[in-house]
Amino acid sequence: MTNEFHHVTVLLHEAVDMLDIKPDGIYVDATLGGSGHSAYLLSLLGDKGHLYCFDQDQKAIDHAQEQLKPYIDKGQVTFIKDNFRHLKVRLLEHGVTEIDGILYDLGVSSPQLDERERGFSYKQDAPLDMRMDSQAALTAYEVVNTYDFNDLVRIFFKYGEDKFSKQIARKIEQARAIKPISTTTELAALIKSAKPAKELKKKGHPAKQIFQAIRIEVNDELGAADASIQQAIELLALDGRISVITFHSLEDRLTKHLFKEASTADAPKGLPFIPDELKPKLELVSRKPILPSQKELMANNRAHSAKLRVARKVRK
């Protein structure tokens, strides 16, 4: 199991250390993944500290149950198999109404990318799937083969920011009229054929942005992150902290917006006095995002686009 779920944790110390861990605190790893952040965070907790780990991928939880066994044996870890958009209600089931810190490592994990049959990668031939939760109903196959032209253009442009969204959607529409598009390599080839030759000379795979867009749509990644981060801000105790690692501009813009909204007074400008209930709930720990070190970038190519934003709760 361990070898099957190899994952190099990004911004490990930065994301956890910035939570300013209290040994007896209650913490949440909203994106368990390869359990690297969880393992480090647990090493900083005392016997009374507790960590709640969310993941919708059963394989991630199975792997973590091996990796974190010493802490499980001490009763310091609780696994919750669910989408983190249900953060508040699932924690409430465990009697938790307030937390000292929470960490998000957004996006798809390395094992999910590397596992061919999950259909996340444009580099390997596999059925079109892209579900983070293998029990979920919507797959990439449904998106590609049943969404109408306008819906395809919308998600390609909104979530992939690809300027050739219309041309790609048209190619897909033409191809699926003959037979369903069923594999990742079929889709990648169609995307490539829709782009002009000069575009194909640019760095990066021509299908990258469209695969990202479909993955975000299948898993409602931005909707889930938006809902979950807002719940997390409410759940934080005074002086509690939230760390969010993002890997593309859409996630980062969302996080930046939510943090800015919560760190701005909800009162008209020019008021001589701001009532406590209108004061900001958050304070930014770092104005600019924290980036991986040069050493980390050399060791892990997937860290290149990572950004970390951290905020602290200053008002309940």
UniProtKB/Swiss-Prot annotation:
Catalyzed reactions per annotation: cytidine(1402) in 16S rRNA + S-adenosyl-L-methionine = N(4)-methylcytidine(1402) in 16S rRNA + S-adenosyl-L-homocysteine + H(+)
Methyltransferase keyword on record: yes
Known EC number: 2.1.1.199
InterPro entries on file: RsmH (IPR002903), SAM-dep_MeTrfase_MraW_recog (IPR023397), SAM-dependent_MTases_sf (IPR029063)
Annotated GO biological process: rRNA base methylation
Key words, A-Z: Cytoplasm, Methyltransferase, rRNA processing, S-adenosyl-L-methionine, Transferase
GO molecular function, one term: rRNA (cytosine-N4-)-methyltransferase activity
Keyword S-adenosyl-L-methionine listed: yes
Binding residues annotated for S-adenosyl-L-methionine, in chain numbering: 35-37, 55, 84, 105, 112
Assigned protein family: Belongs to the methyltransferase superfamily. RsmH family.
Function: Specifically methylates the N4 position of cytidine in position 1402 (C1402) of 16S rRNA.
Protein name: Ribosomal RNA small subunit methyltransferase H
